[in-house]
Amino acid sequence: MNKDESRQRRARQTRIRIAEAQANRLTVIRSNTHISAQVYSPCGTKVVAAASTMEKDLRQAIKNGGNAQAAAQIGKLVAERAVKAGVVDVAFDRSGHRYHGRIKALAEAAREAGLKF
């Protein structure tokens, strides 16, 4: 089993646990150059709020989407949009990535902006 297969297995197990708990899910999608975050409804099919460094208006403000500062801005933005939609309590789905660097920056910014997880 290689590194990516291990990450995908961890992500699958996390998503199963979150689905059993019937909680809103804050999911992080990370690439080398961009980061995205989406808040899913408890059923897992409806996106309640989303933010990404690939959004046109954010690309002007964020020069490099692959660093911790960009991740923090995305975390703050997705949290504001989720709170506006009425979602405060979420389960954090880090997609099998370690809680470090960009993932940690996004999570801390989302907590500061009002999400609880």
Curated annotation (Swiss-Prot):
Q: Which GO cellular component terms, listed alphabetically, does the Swiss-Prot or TrEMBL entry include?
A: cytosolic large ribosomal subunit
- InterPro entries (UniProt xref): Ribosomal_uL18_bac-type, Ribosomal_uL18_bac/euk
For this UniProt entry, the molecular function terms from Gene Ontology, in alphabetical order, are:
5S rRNA binding; structural constituent of ribosome
SS bond partners: none
Coiled coil start-end = none
Q: Does the keyword Cell membrane apply?
A: no
CDD domains associated with the record:
Ribosomal_L18_L5e
Tell me where on the tree of life, at the top rank, the source sits. Answer: Bacteria
Keywords from UniProt, A to Z, are:
Ribonucleoprotein, Ribosomal protein, RNA-binding, rRNA-binding
Picking any one GO biological process from the record gives: translation
Keyword hit for rRNA-binding: yes
Subunit relationships: Part of the 50S ribosomal subunit; part of the 5S rRNA/L5/L18/L25 subcomplex. Contacts the 5S and 23S rRNAs.
The record's family statement is: Belongs to the universal ribosomal protein uL18 family.
Q: What does this protein's UniProt record list under function?
A: This is one of the proteins that bind and probably mediate the attachment of the 5S RNA into the large ribosomal subunit, where it forms part of the central protuberance.
Q: What is this protein called?
A: Large ribosomal subunit protein uL18
Q: Which taxonomic lineage does the organism of this UniProt entry have?
A: Bacteria, Pseudomonadati, Pseudomonadota, Betaproteobacteria, Burkholderiales
Q: Which gene encodes it?
A: rplR
